[in-house]
């Protein structure tokens, strides 16, 4: 039997939150590329903890966003999109996604309602059949699809996998997200919180800074720069005047890619630096002096050290 939740159908937890036993747990978000996982994590956490772009496979490793809702601390694990891997980096990303799912208390499968169960979604459903954790289905972008089609999509997915609950949401405008959070509070086990109350991510600030610059790189260059690029924070210096000096390197594989990253007269790298510096200053609440360098490192995608920098295991063979 399929249990579907939409807006305002979930009873609220009554009583004072601080009088209730605390709950905590890990929720892994999995799904095809560009299903909206990072957008949803940022929405549920209430702050930006995972980068977002229109490009597929933006998330490369598991990112954790930490939300407090009522008496529960919910740790969301934003995993890379699951797709058919072609390169070594692809294999590492997909392995990371399934590894995140296996480590979680609950698995949330996010499906783009417009794309439905085509392609990678079918393969993910097959892979979920033998996963023992409790599973919920979230149909995203419901404002773009007729309700009749949403119900058909939910039924088709539930025929393949026994989901404990199905939610219809919009990660962009927040529709259905409150009901989702209420359900997670009720479902996660009782126990102490894993992180301090004011912590929203477990990502080191140096790595978060690199992720933000990588996002600006994607947003600025669109389809011009292939995925053979990687950003590392090489220097982080707190200065006496209260500012911070950050030096980052954008690694590419060929000179032609370096020219794209720099842009004509350096216009591209200047725009990327300005956008990244602005966001970093807002996050850190202090002035930021950001210096970006572009270096060619052939076949960096075969370098185990680069994988460790991204938080990925290096696949052998």
From Swiss-Prot:
Residues 78-81 are annotated as: G3. Residues 23-190 form the Era-type G domain. Residues 140-143 are annotated as: G4. Keywords: Cell inner membrane, Cell membrane, Cytoplasm, GTP-binding, Membrane, Nucleotide-binding, Ribosome biogenesis, RNA-binding, rRNA-binding. Residues 31-38 are annotated as: G1. The keyword Cytoplasm applies. InterPro entries: G_ERA_dom (IPR030388), GTP-bd (IPR006073), GTPase_Era-like (IPR005662), KH_dom-like_a/b (IPR015946), KH_dom_type_2 (IPR004044), KH_sf_prok-type (IPR009019), P-loop_NTPase (IPR027417), Small_GTP-bd (IPR005225). Residues 221-298 form the KH type-2 domain. It is found in: Cytoplasm; Cell inner membrane. GTP binds at residues 31-38, 78-82, 140-143. Residues 169-171 are annotated as: G5. Residues 57-61 are annotated as: G2. SUPFAM superfamilies: P-loop containing nucleoside triphosphate hydrolases (SSF52540), Prokaryotic type KH domain (KH-domain type II) (SSF54814). One of its GO terms (molecular function) is GTP binding. One of its GO terms (cellular component) is plasma membrane. It is a peripheral membrane protein. GO terms for biological process: ribosomal small subunit assembly. Monomer. An essential GTPase that binds both GDP and GTP, with rapid nucleotide exchange. Plays a role in 16S rRNA processing and 30S ribosomal subunit biogenesis and possibly also in cell cycle regulation and energy metabolism. Belongs to the TRAFAC class TrmE-Era-EngA-EngB-Septin-like GTPase superfamily. Era GTPase family. This is GTPase Era. It comes from Agrobacterium fabrum (strain C58 / ATCC 33970) (Agrobacterium tumefaciens (strain C58)). The gene is era.
């Amino acid at each position: 039997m399929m249990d579907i939740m939409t807006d305002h159908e979930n009873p609220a937890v009554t009583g004072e939150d601080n009088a209730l036993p605390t709950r905590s747990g890990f929720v892994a978000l999995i799904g095809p590329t560009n299903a909206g996982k990072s957008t949803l994590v940022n929405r549920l956490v209430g702050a930006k903890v995972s980068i977002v772009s229109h490009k597929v496979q933006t998330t490369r490793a598991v990112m954790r966003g930490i939300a407090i809702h009522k008496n529960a601390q919910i740790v969301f694990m934003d995993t890379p999109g699951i797709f058919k891997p072609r390169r070594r980096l692809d294999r590492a990303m997909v392995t990371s996604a399934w590894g995140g799912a296996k480590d979680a208390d609950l698995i949330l499968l996010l499906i783009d309602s417009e794309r439905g169960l085509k392609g990678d979604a079918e393969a993910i459903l097959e892979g979920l059949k033998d996963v023992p954790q409790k599973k919920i289905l979230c149909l995203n972008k419901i404002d773009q699809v007729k309700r009749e089609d949403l119900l058909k999509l939910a039924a088709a997915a539930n025929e393949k996998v026994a989901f404990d609950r199905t939610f219809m949401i919009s990660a962009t405008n927040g529709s259905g997200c409150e009901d989702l959070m209420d359900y997670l509070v009720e479902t996660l086990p009782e126990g102490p919180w894993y992180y301090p109350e004011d912590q929203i991510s477990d990502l080191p600030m140096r790595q978060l800074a690199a992720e933000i610059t990588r996002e600006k790189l994607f947003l600025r260059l669109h389809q011009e720069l292939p995925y053979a690029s990687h950003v590392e924070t090489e220097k982080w210096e707190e200065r006496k005047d209260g500012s911070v000096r950050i030096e980052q390197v954008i690694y590419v594989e060929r000179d032609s890619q370096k020219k794209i990253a720099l842009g004509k007269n350096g216009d591209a790298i200047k725009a990327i630096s300005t956008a990244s510096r602005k966001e970093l200053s807002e996050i850190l609440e202090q002035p930021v002096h950001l210096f970006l360098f572009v270096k060619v490192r052939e076949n960096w995608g075969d370098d185990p050290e680069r994988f460790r920098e991204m938080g990925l295991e290096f696949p052998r063979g």
